[in-house]
């Protein structure tokens, strides 16, 4: 199974198939769950939902971003930012991380990832907004994220772990191609609300939600 401060541009998103019935299933840790976390299977929503915008300028921004390799992001500042010191290590061949590491192919892909000057920029694909800057150190066999810069939102203001878990999830899934659970705010208790939050956040590149930190996720191989 299973350079300058930028004004934040809103993402006026419209869902298609929003009235369809969806099946959400909780899986405890065990034989039917390949992860060492309790997860909510939201694939019936995230893998079938379509998103589009009625705003021409947003569609134009999305199309413009498809041709970018992220060089224009160098020295971009994040307004009212905070930083978190971390140590997240990922396998790597030692080469410089430059250019586009992941590009959205459609509007259900919500993120682009770029690397320049030992900074990984995680940006919203619709608008180009830099949400996270991950400062890295590259070695012969790995790269380590040592610091994350971000602007707090309504959820991360009260729970910084969401920032670290978001960045880890995006690197694991988009840059490294893993199927992985993602962490959601504990204030979301309705299953459909969890699915909507997840799709807004990650588009169709998310499958299983959890309330737990995912930094130590282990995957069982059948």
Identify the function of each model-found stretch.
Residues 32-117, 196, 201, 205-222:
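Negatively charged, low-complexity tracts enriched in Asp/Glu with abundant Ser/Thr
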Residues 119-139, 147-150:
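Canonical SH2 domain fold
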Residues 83, 108-111, 131, 143-147:
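A broad structural signal for short, well-ordered beta-strand segments within beta-sheet-rich domains
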Residues 45, 55, 118, 127, ...:
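Generic structural motif
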Residues 2-7, 92-95, 100-102, 115-117, ...:
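A structural signal for the main folded, soluble domain(s) of proteins
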Residues 142-222:
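Polybasic, proline/glycine-rich intrinsically disordered low-complexity segments
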Residues 1-52:
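Non-catalytic accessory regions used for complex assembly or targeting
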């Amino acid at each position: 199974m299973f350079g300058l401060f930028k004004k934040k541009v809103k993402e006026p998103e419209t869902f298609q198939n929003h009235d369809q019935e969806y099946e959400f299933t909780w899986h405890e840790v065990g034989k039917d769950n390949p992860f060492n976390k309790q997860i909510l299977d939201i694939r019936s929503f995230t893998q079938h939902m379509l998103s589009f915008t009625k705003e021409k300028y947003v569609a134009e921004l999305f199309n413009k971003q498809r041709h970018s390799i992220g060089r224009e992001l160098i020295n971009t500042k994040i307004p009212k930012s905070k930083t978190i010191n971390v140590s997240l290590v990922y396998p790597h061949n030692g080469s410089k991380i430059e250019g586009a590491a992941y590009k959205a192919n459609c509007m259900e892909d919500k993120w682009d990832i770029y690397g320049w000057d030992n900074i990984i920029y995680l940006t919203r694909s619709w608008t180009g907004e830099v949400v996270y800057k991950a400062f890295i150190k590259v070695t012969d066999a790995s790269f380590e994220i040592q610091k994350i810069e971000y602007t707090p939102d309504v959820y991360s203001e009260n729970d910084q772990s969401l920032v670290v878990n978001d960045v880890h999830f995006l690197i694991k899934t988009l840059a490294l191609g893993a199927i992985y659970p993602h962490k959601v705010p504990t204030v979301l208790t309705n299953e459909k609300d969890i699915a909507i939050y997840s799709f807004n956040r990650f588009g169709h590149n998310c499958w299983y939600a959890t309330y737990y930190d995912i930094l130590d996720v282990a995957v069982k191989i059948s």
